Amino acid sequence: DLASGDTVLIPYVNRLISAFWAESFRTEGFDARVLENSERILHTGYRHANGGECMPAVAIAGGAIELIRSQKLEPSSTFLYLPAVCMACNFPQFPVMASMATESAGLKGLKVGRVNFLNPGAVLPGMLGMRLFETSVIASLIYKLYHRIRPYEREDGAADRALGDAEGIVLRALRDREGMRKAFGRVAELFRGIERDDAERRPRVAVLGDMYVKYNEVVNQQVTRRIEDLGGEIVLPS
């Protein structure tokens, strides 16, 4: 179980969700570190997997192995936050696979959090579980705004700057324990202020998949950027 003084490893989902999750743990006094997002961690993961697992599960395991080794963390006081929910795929098996892969890498004793995303209070302290859920929703909404506006921006880079500013707004709100609704109101104003030309809508393309794929530019091989380059507008279901 998660204990005071543990180092918490945060899976890389995307730039926003992972940063918000890490900051949520930090506000509760934990040392939280986001796993690397690169092809290298995929190679590491596959060295300690059976080969038939979902790519996101392999990426998470590889990221945990690389971070523990590179930062010389003690597995017994390291907690891998790995939320799951019972659904018709291998999602609930991610924690099992991560435990097996890290043990194969010689990192026995790593705490792999089997956290039900819909009932996190059994594992996580206080309101932390609710904050993690809330920030996941906020991050998803920010990306919806971002992908809705970026293809139509009049000034190149305006949506990217707004995305960076939005990240800062939510991180500060977490540190100050401010309500997320108020923070998101300021984020919405940022994107509302971007000048755009959307009189003629582009073809809309939905990107489906679990959250470790549809947002992750390494695992999905930058599919969202490619769609926009080809003249489409991204729709990311939450």
Model-derived segments and spans:
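An N-terminal assembly and electron-transfer interface module characteristic of large anaerobic redox
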Residues: 1-238
